[in-house]
């Protein structure tokens, strides 16, 4: 019983810390990190989180984090809710954007980094907290259950910063930008 109480204590401590701002993008508020046991609503989760949750008011444009092809649209009310899955096949990775009010793209469509692909919302298992769930998969994984970390990886190390139309991004690896617009001048120094 002691290990369970100790683990619950850690979860409650983490929950009390609240949201964090992304160091490289002061506009981006991370509500729940990869593998976190605290949800976007700051309550304990039953399973580790398979992505990152970013605060976004309902109706905020969600941007493609990298060039890709829409591999599927998701409608999974017990998990992702309305979502978009982008394939980045040159890197054998997929990015998943969940809890949208609606998508602006269709399967098979080519998208460019920074292109609006949908609007943020509270669909699916969002705990009624408006946010965007960003997930990176090594296999198409949008329909898996959150907490199943197989085939997922932490998106944060792949983030190159805020989207800037005039910036060149690495082409030898998957470099993502935040899926939410940053204020002008808020772009980061992490290149």
Regions found by a protein language model. Give the residues of each.
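Active-site loop architecture of trypsin-fold serine endopeptidases
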Residues: 120-133, 141-145
């Amino acid at each position: 019983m002691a290990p369970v109480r100790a683990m619950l204590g850690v979860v409650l401590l983490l929950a009390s810390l609240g949201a964090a701002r992304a160091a490289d993008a002061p506009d981006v508020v991370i509500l729940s990190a990869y593998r976190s046991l605290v949800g976007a609503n700051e309550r304990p989760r039953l399973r580790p989180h398979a992505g990152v949750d970013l605060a976004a008011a309902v109706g905020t444009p969600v941007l493609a984090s990298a060039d890709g092809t829409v591999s599927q649209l998701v409608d999974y009310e017990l998990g992702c809710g309305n979502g978009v899955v982008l394939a980045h096949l040159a890197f054998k990775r997929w990015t998943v954007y969940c809890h949208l009010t609606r998508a602006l793209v269709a399967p098979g469509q080519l998208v460019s980094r920074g292109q609006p692909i949908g609007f943020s919302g509270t669909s699916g298992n969002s705990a009624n907290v408006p946010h965007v769930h960003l997930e990176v998969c090594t296999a198409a994984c949008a329909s898996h259950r959150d907490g199943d970390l197989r085939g997922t990886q932490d998106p944060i190390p792949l983030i190159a910063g805020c989207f800037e139309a005039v910036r060149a991004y690495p082409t030898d690896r998957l470099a993502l930008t935040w899926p939410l617009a940053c204020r002008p001048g808020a772009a980061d120094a992490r290149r």
